[in-house]
Amino acid sequence: MCGIAGYFNPDQNYAENPKQNFHTLSRMINTMNHRGPDTYGHTIINSCCLAHTRLSIIDLENGRQPMSYTKDGNTYYIVYNGEIYNYKEVKKTLLRKNYTFETNSDTEVIIA
């Protein structure tokens, strides 16, 4: 089981004060560390801050979150808890449609 947390305000630019927001995200991560003891991550993107603690199941090294994916000049971010059982088949379909992948994680298949 993983832990996900974050906050969003379209009228704020959290990237302007990353130190304060990193402190807030760190406290959130510490609170939910028992839900994902293997690794953790965070990201601050303009009006959104995301945090994740991970219990590693698939792609132990490269499946860290929050994860980003860029396509056609747009960058998307995800924090996710779950498992996509047919992600290998979905990934094959997306590869035929010229999607590219940097990991073997089921999470990257979702965000693509």
Segments (PLM) and residue ranges:
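N-terminus-centric sequence/structural signature that marks the extreme N-terminus
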Residues: 1-112
